[in-house]
């Protein structure tokens, strides 16, 4: 399932990110690509060793751990520290699938990539082209969100960033190992969580059905989660 998570960063935070990123030193994006995806990857990245990458990454990590909608949709167990890229005119990243296992930066720890995430750092009207195109069983989905918003989607999906025809597209990208690896189970849990939240709004926390559904939700987490 594809999730749109709005306002992960404020407009003020985005503006500060952009100021720092526009003054940064960029390297070729193929440094983090697998052998197959490197052949279709034409973009630029901040180096993983750049102190700016660490600084911005810490801000993004804090924001997503504190975002209730992200937590409900992803059920994160581990998060790869975010990286940052830019696409200038004629740059793109053709259809590819993300690596199933990745190292956490600066450690020997590996994580399974269950969910892929893009945090948009350019407004849609700042560039032409550059859509994130995600393929799933229902077809192709073109995604271009406001700056500060995140799209979250299964890492099993083929996806691309279409060619930039004008302007520059800045973004952050990262991966999540979920407590629940199966996308269909995560979707069921998210739908149940949404129903519980709506019942709490309309009937209050002491409503008996809220208690029953919350019990079911947590028991399903116990049944399906991996730690």
Swiss-Prot record:
Fe cation binds at residues 96, 98, 159. Keywords: Dioxygenase, Iron, Metal-binding, Oxidoreductase, Vitamin C. Pfam families: 2OG-FeII_Oxy_3, PKHD_C. GO terms for biological process: DNA damage response; intracellular iron ion homeostasis. Binds 1 Fe(2+) ion per subunit. HAMAP family: Hydroxyl_YbiX (MF_00657). This is PKHD-type hydroxylase ABSDF3031.
């Amino acid at each position: 399932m594809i999730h749109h998570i709005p306002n992960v960063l404020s407009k003020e935070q985005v503006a500060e990110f952009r100021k720092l990123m526009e003054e940064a030193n960029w390297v070729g994006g193929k440094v983090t690509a697998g052998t197959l995806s490197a052949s279709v990857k034409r973009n630029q990245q901040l180096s993983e060793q750049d102190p700016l990458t660490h600084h911005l990454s810490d801000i993004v990590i804090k924001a997503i751990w504190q975002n209730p909608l992200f937590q409900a949709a992803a059920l994160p167990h581990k998060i790869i520290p975010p990286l940052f890229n830019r696409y200038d005119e004629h740059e793109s990243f053709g259809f590819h699938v993300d690596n199933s296992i990745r190292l956490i930066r600066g450690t020997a720890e590996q994580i399974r990539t269950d969910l892929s995430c893009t945090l948009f750092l350019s407004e849609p009207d700042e560039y032409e082209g550059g859509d994130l195109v995600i393929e799933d069983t229902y077809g192709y989905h073109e995604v271009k969100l406001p700056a500060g918003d995140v799209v979250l989607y299964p890492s099993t999906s083929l996806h691309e960033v279409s060619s930039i025809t004008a302007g520059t597209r800045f973004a952050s990208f990262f991966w999540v190992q979920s407590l629940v690896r199966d996308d269909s189970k995560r979707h069921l849990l998210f739908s149940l969580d949404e129903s519980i939240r709506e019942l709490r709004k309309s009937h209050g926390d002491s409503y008996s059905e809220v208690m029953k559904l919350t019990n079911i939700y947590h028991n399903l987490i116990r049944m399906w989660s991996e730690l």
